[in-house]
Amino acid sequence: NKVFVAKRIDNPKNFWQMPQGGVDEGEDFLTAAYRELEEETSIKKVEIIKEIDGTITYELPDHLLGIIWKGKYKGQKQKWFIMRFLGNDEEINIKTNKPEFLEWKWIDLDKLTEVVVDFKLHVYKELKEKIKKIIN
């Protein structure tokens, strides 16, 4: 039960996250998930295990408002998909055209909430519990 996490370039502290991103106009959630995964990690070979029901929302802390996303947004409403990676680790490349990550690793699902930034902790707690119910 390993999950992919990566350390963001814009946060030099030891905080990790799973790939995520926005939905372009006219794009559905699943298409956006595939696109963001490939843009951030070069990963193409995946299968969908399950779409997580509902959305999970977080807001940026006050000290980051106006800094992150050029002040355009104050948080995110996220739609998550559980995917199984079907490729080899050698296919993973975070040195993309617009790199977002410094490094990546596989971690145990149970460790997920130990490595994320505080303001996203509730997102990853909820996500971890939903994933556990689906894969067990």
What function would you assign to each model-found segment?
Residues 1-18:
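N-terminal strand-loop-strand
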Residues 129-136:
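Generic C-terminal helix-cap and adjacent flexible tail
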Residues 14-18, 102-103, 126:
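A short, polar/proline- and glycine-enriched secondary-structure boundary/capping micro-motif
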Residues 24-118, 122:
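Unchanged
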Residues 7, 116, 128:
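Short, flexible helix/strand-to-coil boundary loops that buttress conserved ligand/catalytic motifs
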Residues 19-23:
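Short helix/strand-bridging catalytic loops that position acidic/His residues to coordinate divalent metals
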